[in-house]
Amino acid sequence: MSYAQFQVSASTGYAIASAGMKTGESINSSGTENHYGSYGEGVNFQIRGTYFFNESFGADLSFGYLNGADQTISKVDLPTQQVDAIARARAYGASLSMVYKFTNNVYGRFGALLKIGGKTEAVVSNRADLTQTQLDQFAAAGFTLPSGSYTQTNYVEDFHGVFPLGFVAALGYKYDLNSNFSLFAEAEYYGISLKRKDSELQSFNTDLYLPDGTLAQAGLYTMDNLPAGRALKITYSDELTHAEQADPSKELAQKVPYSSFGINIGITYKFNSASKVQ
């Protein structure tokens, strides 16, 4: 007897950090606190095609989108500076897995996971009082500012990574509605990290304010006039010479966590199986 069955599924779910790594810090007048998490945390959407070779074993190809939750990079609350910087994933991925039916309702799958596109988006707000040195520099340029004047910088930066290979595993339960449709719920684990390749500013603006909040100068720095030490695009590599380390457009590479554990719910449409006795 030969057996073949094809089904398609659509699902959504939410994942939390698994073995979270440090993503940033909070600093205030009393101390410093680490923040841990994973860029794999958030809401995901998946479509999947599964082909069963027999009543137990099959192969599964899926494509998904991750709308990642905000992760704290930096949060500073000091009398002279306030920073609120978060980053979040907007990523596309694919997986190829083997599927095994333990019973007619319980199944498991495991296989390879690949991030195929997207970005990690950083959104930063930085309010910083001018130092005395900066006030003196403005005065030397003929622009006298009172003590307590400050800058407000807002920017968005997109980070891209090298395509990584990871691991996916899931255990699920399906409930048949009829001969073609079924609902399912599953617990899913992703094990993957992303090595950064480059980043690029999408927007950048710094305004200058007087102590009472009056705007003194709009667009002190912009995308066309970045401050010293700030590059429009940064490339990441495993090695840098001493000369390259002084170049703001080059930085050492780092890996960021995407591992997660989540719950998915969805619906499956099962095409009529093709089986015959010979």
Residue spans of the language-model regions?
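Outer-membrane beta-barrel strand-turn architecture
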Residues: 2, 51-55, 100-106, 175-177, ...
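Transmembrane beta-barrel strands of outer-membrane/channel proteins
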Residues: 10-16, 61-65, 110-118, 185-191
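Outer-membrane beta-barrel "beta-signal"
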Residues: 7, 257-278
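Repeated loop/turn-to-beta-strand initiation elements of outer-membrane beta-barrel proteins
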Residues: 6-8, 56-59, 105-108, 180-183, ...
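Active-site/pore-lining binding-face segments in mid-to-C-terminal subdomains
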Residues: 159, 164-203
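Extracellular/periplasm-exposed beta-strand and loop segments of Gram-negative cell-envelope proteins
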Residues: 17-40, 64-93, 116-164, 195-260
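Residues on the lipid-exposed face of transmembrane beta-strands in outer-membrane beta-barrel proteins
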Residues: 45-51, 94-100, 110-114, 167-175, ...
